[in-house]
Structure formats: C-alpha cells, structure tokens
Amino acid sequence: MKRVFINDIRDIANASREKLFAQSQSVGRDRPLVIMHWTAGWGDQLFDDYHVSVTTDGKIYIAEDSFAETLSHTWHLNTGTVGVTMCCAVGADTEDLGEEPPTDSQIEVFSQVVAAICDGTWLTINKDNVLTHGEAADSLEFYDPEDLYGPRTTCERWDLEYLGTKESPIFNPWASDGSRGGDVLRGKANWYHNYWAENAKKA
C-alpha cells in the first residue's frame, strides 16, 4: 500500500479513464462506476481489495498504481469499477457503528477522493455512477431480484448506509430526505468538485 494525496488520485484516475471505460463496455455497461465501502475493520487497518483506502486520521492509500486493475471489492461488479473505502466500523451494526465509526476528517477526505476520481474519469457525481456497496447491492441495474443483498433486502452488505453524524444519524435505507450515507457523501463530493472548479477559474 502506498500513501498518496488528492492530486495523485486525480492523476491516476485520469490515466485510468480510457481503460476503465473499455472494461465497462466489455461487460455491457456504458460507464465506469465508483463503489464506496467501509472495511468493517480498525481505523488504520488496510486491505488490498480496494483501490483507495482512507484511514480515520484522513490519510489516503492506494493498492495499485492504476484504478483499472480489477480488485475484489464488490460481488460480480468489479470490472471497470473503482473501489474506495473508509477504514472504520469494526463491530458495527445497524444500531451502533462500533468502536471505530467514521470520523469527520475521514468523511471529508473520502468525499474529496470520490470527487477527484470522478473528475479524472469524467463521471458526473450522482447515484447512477457513484454508489455505496449497499446501494449497488440493492440495484436492479446490476443484479437479478433474487440476487439482491443490500440494506433494503437481505442486509448482507450495508456499507456507509449511515455515518453516525448529524447529517446521517441512523440506519434508514428507505429515507428520502438525503440522510442516507451515500446521499451525504455524494453531496460532499459534489461540493468539492464545484469548489475546485471555481478556484480553477480564478487561478
């Protein structure tokens, strides 16, 4: 695992873009995906199943020098997909996020990582392109009805369904008020995307 910074993430995403699109098209999708996870481990515990990992103190690590390397982070959905994870949530359940919940700094850095990947791959930051593992696991775009395994079905995977923050306080996969973890993270990522774009105009 190698420590990197936000500009590195954008550069790697840009260099990986063409191959990611080609991989996606090879499995019948028209675009790459970004799947957001947590490790369900300790805050500094790294796993090489994910392209990018963010620790609880906000440090960023990559497992490979290309995001087009296929890693095993999401069941039947790894080709042409970038897996990003927060190192947190050991012992978490739907009532309590355990001994190491996501930290504020981790959430902000993670959102910047998502924004940088989407900038580099030319992906719009929305739920079609950027999903939590749980959202992907409940998606009929990717799975047959009998194979769904997210928080609205079997709950085998519910990564980042809630963040334990004011914006996303509780487990509620049916929420439509923007409080689901994926909605909050996409909102933050879009904020960073827009902030960087405005600053670039002023430079």
Locate predicted features.
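Structural preference for beta-strand elements that scaffold enzyme active sites
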Residues: 33, 81-83, 129-131
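Basic/polar, cationic surfaces and motifs that engage anionic cell-wall
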Residues: 1-28, 92-203
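Short, solvent-exposed loop/turn segments at the edges of secondary structure
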Residues: 29-31, 47, 77-81, 125
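Residue-level marker of positions within ordered structural domains that often coincide
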Residues: 41, 57, 89, 115, ...
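Short, conserved "active-site rim" segments that organize catalytic pockets and cofactor/ligand binding
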Residues: 1-70
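Peptidoglycan-targeting cell-wall enzymes and recognition modules
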Residues: 51-104
